[in-house]
């Protein structure tokens, strides 16, 4: 997003495609990339170095537990569906707690991998959810904390 510096969390960052792309394109924003998988974190660090992205912090974290003292303007996630619905829903719950007022949650999810139940859970938490894009079975959901 353009404008003043924002804080952005990429939850379940994997090897880093989302967080690093945003960090590279928007060097004035502060990106925190979180994952519980050590291999994913090592690859994210390697990609951060290779792409010379300086405004990104990469941390080991179970959902958002490592940043429970911090609030964000934006939280992005392509949740680890294979980890199970409980973990995915915990990401949404912790995202609600860690977002600033008027903060935004963005979720990338496949319809066949739980989009309807994810959408329902997000709507229960946030009171709103919008499908802002869909293509080839993938959906991007957006919610605003109000």
Predicted segments, located by residue:
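Conserved beta-strand signature within the Rossmann-like core of class I S-adenosyl-L-methionine
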Residues: 102-109
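Core SAM-dependent methyltransferase catalytic element
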Residues: 134-146
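Conserved class I S-adenosyl-L-methionine
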Residues: 110-125
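A short glycine-rich, Lys/Arg-flanked "PGG" loop and its adjoining helix->strand segment in the class I
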Residues: 90-101
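Class I S-adenosylmethionine-dependent transferase superfamily signal
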Residues: 22, 95, 122
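Glycine-rich phosphate-binding "P-loop"
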Residues: 77-86
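Short beta->alpha hinge that forms the Motif I/post-I loop of the SAM-binding pocket
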Residues: 35-38, 87, 110
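Conserved SAM/SAH cofactor-binding pocket of Class I
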Residues: 1-77
């Amino acid at each position: 997003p353009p404008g003043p510096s924002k804080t952005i969390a990429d939850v379940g960052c994997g090897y880093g495609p989302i967080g690093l792309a945003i960090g590279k394109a928007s060097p004035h924003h502060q990106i925190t990339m979180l994952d519980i998988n050590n291999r994913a974190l090592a690859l994210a660090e390697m990609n951060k170095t290779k792409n010379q992205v300086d405004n990104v912090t990469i941390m080991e974290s179970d959902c958002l537990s490592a940043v429970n003292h911090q609030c964000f303007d934006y939280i992005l996630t392509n949740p680890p569906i294979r980890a199970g619905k409980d973990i995915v829903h915990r990401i949404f719950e912790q995202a609600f707690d860690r977002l600033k007022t008027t903060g935004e949650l963005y979720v990338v999810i496949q319809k066949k991998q739980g989009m309807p139940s994810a959408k329902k859970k997000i709507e229960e938490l946030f009171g709103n959810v919008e499908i802002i894009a869909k293509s080839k079975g993938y959906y991007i959901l957006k919610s605003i904390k109000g």
